[in-house]
Every structure is written in structure tokens, then in C-alpha cells.
Amino acid sequence: MQLPSRGTDWIAPVLRLPRNAGRGLIWLYRHTLSPLVGYNCRHYPTCSMYGDEAIRKFGLWAGGWMTLARLLRCQPWGTSGIDLVPQTAPSRARWYLPWRYARWRGVNAPPPDVAEPCGCGSHSQLTPH
């Protein structure tokens, strides 16, 4: 015997509203203000791409804090280069300690072709013999 549906199909879209609103604001920025001021981000991916991915992966609260930290790092005396969204949220992050979601300081990531050797022997062609 199957229980009748109580009409809870509306919950998932409602829970996605904050995430979609944050991503919508980034979309609006990318299509209005960004073309006017120019594309001059110091990082790859750009700050707006980073913010969109962080909010998509982690939601508006955690992704928003990650994006804020990235924007503060993207300044003349800040970092530059490759700065990807983390695959997982930091283990020490809690909703009531939001600053722990983000990396507030950072170092420039090395280019992929001079990355540190992993010990697998595939990087031997990078060094001259």
C-alpha cells in the first residue's frame, strides 16, 4: 500500500531560491557591469566565474563567503594566477563561523607546467638533463 503524496514537491525549489538568487546577481554583473569596466581579473577562473561555481557547489552562505574572500584577494597587492574553487568545504567550517569557509590569504599557484613532482616519474621531461 502506497501512502498518498502530501505535496512536498515544492520544498526543493524553495530551498534553491537563495542559491539561484546569488547566481542570478553574478549573471547580472557579468552581462551588464563587467563588459563596461573590462575583463581584468588577476585570477583564473575570473572572480565572477569563481563566485558562480562556489555558490553552485556550496550554496549562498558558504559560497558567498568564499567569493567575498576571493574578491578581497583580487587586488594589486593580492594573489594572482590559478585559484580554483575547493572540491569540498573546509572541515573546520561551521555555519555560525562563516569566515572559516574561505581562504583569506593565499599564495600564487605555480603554473601547471612547473608543478612540483608527485614522485610518479612523469615530470622528468620538465627538467633539462
Swiss-Prot record:
Name under which the protein is recorded: Putative membrane protein insertion efficiency factor
PANTHER family from the UniProt entry: MEMBRANE PROTEIN INSERTION EFFICIENCY FACTOR-RELATED
Source organism superkingdom: Bacteria
Summary of the function given for this chain in its UniProt record: Could be involved in insertion of integral membrane proteins into the membrane.
Main localization category: membrane
Compartments it resides in: Cell inner membrane
NCBIfam families, per the entry: membrane protein insertion efficiency factor YidD
Family: Belongs to the UPF0161 family.
Organism: Rhodopseudomonas palustris (strain TIE-1)
Membrane topology classification: Peripheral membrane protein
Swiss-Prot/TrEMBL keywords: Cell inner membrane, Cell membrane, Membrane
This protein's record includes keyword Calcium: no
